[in-house]
């Protein structure tokens, strides 16, 4: 009998990974508050983030050199302006990788929708490069690198349910939110996050969401407590500019959602349902009405 501790596995050149596939999950904001505008132009936020089951798929392949991005989406750049490219370049430069990478993005998360589609693709790229080139980075390492790409990237590396503070980079993992069904709808408009924050006057926010109360409700596994505290101060800007968002929120409630909210800077709206069948019927109805 051999003790497991005495077994050593020697890595050979043939064992290196040449291809890797990873899913990049979208997020919604169960609650979003803007505390104040910072001197550097950013905003201090306090929000509860939640991963949802909508995801992009990224395929990685080793190459002799360079970074090549391809995608089935005709709406995204494939050059240095793409966050996937920026994340891959960051990893190559940081860890002195001498080879290149080809990355194919299968896009499912709506673009410019307030669901962190670009950020989660960047986070998946950090993870994918780590695995493909066997870099040995910890989750903490990747989260710290992610700050250099975007404020939501560290959260997207971590995923799950979390409290985000600072500019979104200070994260506190929370217990998983209670089981429920989430229906997501995006009107046929794109919203610039930059536009929303530029038009938000943080000093004029009269009612702030009860984020601390929501965190307590999550700890107590109280779905009703979470639903009662669902608020997003960015709605004051985005809904004013695009009234269709409020119409979708109201329609979701008419179709059985216990509550509905705009995610992030919008325009995506999500509704929370207790019963799967009701969520499915609401989906069918919204599809029929669009």
Residue positions per predicted region:
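ATP-binding N-lobe of GHMP and related small-molecule kinases
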Residues: 6, 10, 17-113, 131, ...
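Short, conserved charged micro-motifs
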Residues: 41, 68, 276-282
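Solvent-exposed alpha-helices and their adjacent loops that cap or buttress functional pockets
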Residues: 50-51, 147-148, 154-157, 173-178, ...
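Glycine/serine-rich anion-binding loops at beta->alpha junctions
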Residues: 104-133, 151, 257-273
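Contiguous, small/hydrophobic- and glycine-enriched helical/loop subdomains that border
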Residues: 122, 126-163
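Conserved, helical-rich catalytic subdomain that frames metal- and/or nucleotide-binding sites
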Residues: 158, 163-259, 274-277, 284-287
């Amino acid at each position: 009998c051999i003790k497991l501790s005495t077994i050593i596995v020697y890595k050979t050149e043939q064992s290196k990974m040449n291809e890797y596939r990873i899913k990049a999950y979208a997020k919604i904001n169960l609650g979003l508050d803007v505390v104040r505008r910072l001197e550097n132009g950013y905003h201090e936020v306090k929000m509860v983030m939640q991963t949802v089951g909508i995801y992009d798929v990224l395929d990685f392949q080793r190459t002799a050199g360079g970074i090549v991005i391809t995608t089935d989406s005709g709406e995204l750049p494939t050059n240095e302006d793409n966050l996937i490219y920026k994340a891959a370049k960051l990893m190559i430069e940081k860890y002195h990788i001498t080879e290149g990478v080809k990355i194919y993005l299968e896009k499912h998360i709506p673009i410019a929708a307030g669901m962190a589609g670009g950020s989660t693709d960047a986070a998946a790229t950090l993870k994918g490069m780590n695995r493909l080139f066997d870099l040995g980075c910890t989750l903490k390492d990747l989260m710290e690198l992610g700050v250099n790409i975007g404020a939501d990237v560290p959260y997207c590396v971590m995923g799950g349910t979390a409290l985000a503070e600072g500019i979104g980079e200070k994260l506190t993992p929370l217990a998983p939110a209670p089981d429920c069904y989430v229906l997501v709808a995006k009107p046929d408009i794109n919203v610039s996050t930059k536009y929303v924050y530029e038009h938000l006057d943080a000093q004029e926010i009269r009612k702030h969401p009860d984020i601390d109360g929501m965190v307590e409700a999550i700890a107590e596994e109280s779905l009703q407590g979470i639903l009662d505290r669902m608020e997003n101060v960015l709605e004051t800007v985005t809904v004013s500019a695009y009234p269709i968002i409020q119409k979708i929120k109201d329609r979701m409630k008419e179709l059985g959602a216990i509550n509905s909210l705009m995610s992030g800077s919008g325009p995506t709206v999500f509704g929370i349902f207790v019963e799967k069948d009701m969520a499915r019927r609401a989906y069918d109805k919204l599809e029929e009405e669009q």
